[in-house]
Amino acid sequence: LYRGHQPMCKKKEGNTYAIILNGEIYNMKTLKEQLIKEGEMFSTTSDTEVVLTGYIRYGISYIEELNGIFSIALWDGKRKKLYLIRDRVGVKPLFYTKRGDTLIFASEIKGLFAYPGVKPVINREGLCEIFGLGPAKSYGKGVFKDIYEVLPGHFLEYDRDGLKDHAYWE
């Protein structure tokens, strides 16, 4: 991570943007070259900086350009939105739960249980599905109650209006 400096933050026009990226962007070199042609400058060699710079320049639609395996958390200080983004086929996991107005997320379920008040309560429906399909399961369903995963090819948008799920790839 020393090259990626995560979480990575950038300021632009008085707004703060932050990103955490778990994974690899296969077309990073091409994306970076395009951004450089458009006048962007980079201080690292990381995928993380390329994704953040592309987002700041183009907005959330930039994720459609990403080819790779990844889970991303991205804070947009200008719009006051948090995005949770998962790769097209769901190689990299990304789990979340809500407690009141707080959205808790992690790349592993055990990371959610480290948050006070998030308990590992068994979800009977999810458990039955695993025993019935095992070891496969439906995306979005799990063994633990109120623990969800961002679907492959989707992103979540979280702001003062709540949580919205969007598909960016099918």
Residue positions per predicted region:
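Cysteine-centered catalytic environments shared across enzyme families
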Residues: 1-170
